């Protein structure tokens, strides 16, 4: 199984509100767009590499927002993936909309796909149903942002909550399976994988984030 949370390329010198204070949305050079053509080339390249790595019965989860998810979804289907679900992660307490000119952004999207339409993928339907009070698990998930414990060794500007990763991993993999994260960040995917008896492999170019992930995984 692959879980990918790629750069959204949203570091555009704008501002947001965090804990009642104005903060820059810039996260680093790794999140700055080099133009639509370059972004498209970047997304397609790693999606093709992941496609080659993915086992015939494996699945991939890819995160995004409306800024990039439509492009990613198009490219995934061009590469050959078959999309299974469009998961909506709802944030219960999102940053306020400072412009007051459109609805408050309160969700992110996760595309879940298998290698091709005929592939027999893993999905623990009964487990997910049991976790949802005996009802079918829907594709809208509500999770709060990472808590303080998850940031003990430091934080990542786009860190996903551990509970979100746990649901993805538990629903679509088995004990002993290898989970790969091509954009490891703070290592949350690895923490969730190891916690539930899976193996883990991750990549991270930013040295500070690599060291953060290493500390979390060694714990």
Task: Go through the PLM ranges and name each one.
Residues 214-219:
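Short, conserved SAM-binding/catalytic segment
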Residues 1-211:
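Core catalytic lobe of class I
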């Amino acid at each position: 199984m692959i879980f990918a949370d790629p750069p959204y390329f949203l570091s555009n010198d704008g501002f947001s509100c965090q804990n009642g204070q104005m903060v820059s949305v810039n996260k680093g050079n790794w999140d700055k767009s080099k133009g639509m053509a370059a972004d498209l080339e970047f997304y397609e390249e790693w999606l093709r590499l992941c496609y080659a790595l993915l086992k015939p019965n494996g699945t991939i989860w890819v995160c995004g927002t409306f800024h990039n998810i439509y492009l990613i979804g198009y490219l995934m289907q061009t590469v050959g993936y078959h999309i299974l679900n469009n998961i909506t992660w709802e944030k219960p307490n999102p940053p306020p909309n400072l412009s007051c000119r459109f609805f408050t952004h309160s969700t992110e999207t996760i595309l879940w796909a298998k290698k091709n339409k005929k592939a027999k993928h893993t999905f623990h339907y009964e487990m997910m149903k049991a976790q949802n009070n005996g009802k079918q698990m829907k594709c809208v998930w509500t999770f709060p942002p990472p808590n303080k414990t998850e940031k003990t060794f430091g934080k990542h500007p786009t860190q996903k909550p551990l509970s979100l990763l746990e649901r993805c991993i538990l629903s679509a993999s088995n004990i002993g399976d290898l989970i790969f994260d091509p954009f490891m960040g703070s290592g949350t995917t690895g923490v969730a994988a190891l916690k539930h008896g899976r193996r883990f492999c991750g990549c991270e170019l930013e040295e500070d984030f690599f060291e953060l992930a290493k500390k979390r995984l060694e714990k």
